[in-house]
């Protein structure tokens, strides 16, 4: 029997990689499964900081599960097929651990599925460690903590669940770090955008959502200076136009998120700008508009777009 591949979504972030490492370890220890962690893309700068800090090698990148000889896979931090490996429909999904909406997901066989509306997939995996009485190694605790910090912007995002505020200090202690100091350093590591091309910038953390027959790409970049990113607007818009043409997106929505002040600027291009404007009750000027208090794609952008595109 081949190894069960464990991986997060395309354009992996710290939670996608952290939760997959953690669950692969738990699956071996608690369930006796033969698992291997892989990824659907290279780590971003934030995640590279995390892996280096805790001395963990980056997972190898795959583009096909079947090409790896895999018959079964476990998904963490996602379930929608368009966000997963290209041939996901051709292998058996053994299990899913996720904290997002369920959409465009169907399996031929029963599976193990753990879904909770918490701040990160890592939060769920940590609870499973405790349920099974499995000791958490320091580096695994660090990866799960990093996934939680990343997805909740150090517990400031509205996606933060009350249990996340309990879990974070526990994981910080297990990882041997100061929660606030490490969290801020980690988040700042992911805001170095100057070295990124516009094409790289709009793909750092991007997901495609099928909204009422429209393929809508929603990307997010974190920064400490929104104005600095907007100085590159012409370059970014050219990259977005190319991405739309190359991939058949109907619309492209980019969140430029200020992690210090917890606000975002929305830059949007596509065929349904009236629906984007209606979603957030704003008017786009020169293709962008300010969205006060918005830091979460999952809670403050995608549900609003979903409702607007369905109206």
Curated annotation (Swiss-Prot):
Q: Which organism is it from?
A: Streptococcus sanguinis (strain SK36)
Please tell me whether the keyword Cytoplasm is annotated for this protein. yes
* Name used for this protein in its record: Probable manganese-dependent inorganic pyrophosphatase
- Cofactor-binding details, from the entry: Binds 2 manganese ions per subunit.
The enzyme's main class, written as a single word, is: hydrolase
NCBIfam families the record matches: PRK05427.1 (NF003877)
Binding-site residues for Mn(2+) 1, renumbered to this chain: 9, 13, 77
Q: Which domain of life is it from?
A: Bacteria
The coenzyme or cofactor needed here is: Mn(2+)
Q: Which InterPro entries match?
A: DDH_dom, DHH_sf, DHHA2, DHHA2_dom_sf, Mn-dep_inorganic_PyrPase, Oligoribo/pAp-PDE_c-di-AMP_PDE
Is the Manganese keyword given for this protein?
yes
Question: HAMAP family, per this entry?
Answer: PPase_C (MF_00207)
The main location is: cytoplasm
């Amino acid at each position: 029997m081949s190894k069960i591949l464990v991986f997060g979504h395309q354009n992996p972030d710290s939670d996608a990689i952290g939760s997959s490492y953690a669950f692969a370890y738990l699956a071996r220890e608690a369930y006796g499964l033969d698992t291997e962690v892989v990824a659907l893309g290279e780590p971003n700068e934030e995640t590279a900081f995390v892996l280096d800090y805790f001395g963990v090698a980056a997972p190898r990148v795959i583009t096909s599960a079947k090409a790896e000889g895999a018959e079964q896979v476990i998904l963490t931090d996602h379930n929608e097929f368009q966000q997963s490996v290209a041939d996901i429909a051709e292998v058996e999904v053994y299990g899913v651990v996720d904290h997002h909406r369920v959409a465009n997901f169907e399996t031929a066989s029963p599976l193990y599925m753990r879904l909770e509306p918490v701040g990160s997939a890592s939060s769920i995996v940590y609870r499973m460690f405790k349920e099974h009485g499995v000791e958490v190694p320091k580096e695994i605790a660090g990866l799960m903590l990093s996934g939680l910090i990343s997805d909740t912007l150090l517990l400031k995002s509205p996606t933060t669940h009350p249990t996340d505020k309990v879990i974070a200090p526990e994981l910080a202690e297990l990882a041997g770090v100061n929660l606030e100091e490490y969290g801020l350093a980690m988040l700042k590591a992911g805001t170095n955008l100057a070295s990124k091309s516009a094409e790289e910038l709009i793909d750092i953390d991007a997901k495609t959502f099928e909204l009422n027959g429209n393929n809508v790409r929603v990307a997010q970049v974190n920064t400490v200076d929104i104005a600095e990113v907007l100085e590159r607007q012409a370059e970014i818009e050219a990259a977005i136009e190319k991405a739309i043409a190359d991939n058949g997106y109907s619309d492209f929505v980019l969140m430029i998120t200020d992690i210090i002040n917890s606000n975002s600027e929305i830059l949007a291009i596509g065929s349904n700008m009236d629906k984007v404007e209606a979603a957030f009750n704003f008017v786009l000027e020169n293709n962008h508009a300010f969205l006060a208090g918005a830091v979460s794609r999952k809670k403050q952008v995608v549900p609003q777009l979903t409702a607007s595109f369905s109206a």
